[in-house]
Structure formats: C-alpha cells, structure tokens
Amino acid sequence: FKDASVDILNFIQCTLRINPDEFDFLGGCDGLDGVMMQLGAVGCVSFMAVPFPKEMKDIVDAGLAGDYKKCMEAQHKVLRIRNLCKQAPFNAAWIYAMKYGGGPVGMHSRMPKDQDFVPEMLKTQLDDLAKEYGYDVL
C-alpha cells in the first residue's frame, strides 16, 4: 500500500492494524519518505526517484537498516530538492530535473503550457544543487 496522504497519524493507525509480515507499506511523499521508513514503511514510490535516484535510495537503504541519523540526513537532502521543485507550477521542475537521473527526459506534462514553466533562476538553482550532489549537469 502506497501512502501519499502526508497524514502520519493515519499511517501509524494503519500500521497498528496490519501484520507487517503479510502487508507492506510504501511511502509516497518525497517530503516524508524518511519519516515513513522509520515508522515501518519498506520502501517508497517517488517521482523524485526519477531525477534523483541516489538520494531516494539512500533514504530507503538507511531506513531499512534502522539507521535513523542517515535516513534523516538523506531526507534533508531530498527536502532541499523538493523545496526548489515546489517553486514551479505543478510538476514542471521535476520534469526539468529528470535530466539528472540519466533516464528518459520528459518534455511537457499534460498540463497547460503555463503550468510547464520553470523560471531560469530556478533552473540554475536546481542545476547547482544537482552539481553539489554529484550529478552531471548538461
């Protein structure tokens, strides 16, 4: 079950009522996946994993290992990315950032043209952060 509700109390209530040997929870919000791993999630389904796969994998690996400190350090790295991406409409910044992960690059979302706009200053900030995190920026 993927929980992208950002409702931590609901997530904990669900974990209270299931057998974790028979039912897996996945985090579904880039801003909370580290916390959800600490609360019993076994992984995450994340749009952020396309442009920044290493950072999302670091959250999951540290969470599965029970390393709270590393998990939250990885979560904080992702929050820096997310805080920038949230400055553009809809998912335009995530689509722009897909070039960092080495996978297919999205051209446009299904949203109107004005919803695909990423300001040049934001592109520069994303590129700078990607460089800081060790990604090749074209």
Where does each model-flagged region fall?
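C-terminal alpha-helical cap/extension of soluble enzyme domains
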Residues: 48, 52-138
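Catalytic alpha/beta core domains of metabolic enzymes, predominantly
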Residues: 2-86
